[in-house]
């Protein structure tokens, strides 16, 4: 297939069966050459001249469809029995119900995660009968979904990475929509060892057929009998992030929040989940899971958003234990670094004969074995360099000490421009950590009702910079004081959608074992002889209890 030059920023303007809107997406392919701008106004076309049976079956036989629906109904019943925290209080006569219903209808016009509104398992997963049966039977036994791993376990459903993945279109999409879909496939080609080849004449063997018969939907993994499988992409799904999400399903990936370790990172708010959707939140079985050592990722493109499947769209169904990660989950802009890392571990681990000494959480790039694939914010052969600013002179390595050092978005307090990016690496002296605080006015574009950042300042303060960090956006200065787990802290400024006021922050170095406050004044003496009284001071430690 023809390869597009690596792109850091890709803007797509889509008007198709939705109110006009601008949708921007960023593609980090490891290098910057050009901005690729695909602009189109797709004609308002019919969904797809498909029969009701085609919409209902989605590639299954009538008997297979009945079997899947049987087990999905059982899962709904099981979810309601296990989690009866809520019940349907809606009444058409209730004014609050009418207001909330209108709010829900208004929110649907934005469709940040259109795949959530599907009628399939978890909204967009088309199950085969044996998958539906396995999920239900193991949920019945263990209370969890017994799925082999975040990546599907069966070799029968794994694609052969040494052979091209054949795909075609069935005529549902305009030529411009087809080009957007192919851009998403080309991006995946650039960042993995997988190759996609279009062949509209293929009529046998495994292949992906892009259609528009049932919203955003896909099977999970390769068809085990070597037949075609459908990936449905309706007009509202023609966005790079949503396409990447559905193609990831086709390659064998489940949703992130279904991992067995999810309860260490998020809290499922069962009382806020729609009564027919509780079965969508069951977990994988921890006894039979392998996530290839890749940790839970708040920024995964496979993660539900905060209010997915809620009884009303203003209720949270997923809360992050660390509050500052709340606006990170649910993004549909691009594959996260860990999404790509897991895909390469599953499919491409044997491509390069030598593993490079990559830094900052990077790994040997299976597409270019002489270089490392680096987390956002880093570049260079071994990820040893901070990514330079894009569209502005900004970012870089900052050595901090006990005094405050300030840094800000481009032009602050004037507005930054759409498309500008900055990356900072803040470094404290050995044995110390970095403390960071936001100061001054703060403004970054967000979807307030969805609790989701569109443009953001991301802070990575963990021991692994491959992990997506805490994203800050919207209006009002964040009050959080952030401390790093090591001597280093990464700050990423990303403006994909629009300009704004931006941010200003300050940083300093603190002792790793905590910082003592000043002594308080002596208290008054309690005896006339003097030489008595007391004074005190406190110590604030960045991570847990202070050492004695």
Swiss-Prot record:
Which Cys pairs are S-S linked?
A: 193-348, 216-237, 352-372, 374-383, 394-422, 525-546, 529-546, 541-546
Q: How is the cofactor bound?
A: Binds 1 zinc ion per subunit.
What does UniProt list as catalytic? 246
Could you cite one Gene Ontology molecular function of this protein?
A: metalloendopeptidase activity
Report residues carrying sugar chains.
190, 461
Principal subcellular localization: secreted
Recorded hits in InterPro entries, A to Z, give:
Astacin-like_dom, CUB_dom, EGF-like_dom, MetalloPept_cat_dom_sf, Metallopeptidase_nem, Peptidase_M12A, Peptidase_Metallo, Sperma_CUB_dom_sf
- CUB domain mapped to chain residues: 394-510
Needs which cofactor? Zn(2+)
What domain of life is recorded for the organism?
Eukaryota
Q: Which GO terms describe its biological process?
A: molting cycle, collagen and cuticulin-based cuticle; proteolysis
Role summary:
Metalloprotease which cleaves the carboxyl terminus of procollagens to mature collagens. Probably involved in cuticular collagen maturation.
Instruction: List the PANTHER family.
Output: DISCOIDIN, CUB, EGF, LAMININ , AND ZINC METALLOPROTEASE DOMAIN CONTAINING, ZINC METALLOPROTEINASE DPY-31
Protein known as? Zinc metalloproteinase dpy-31
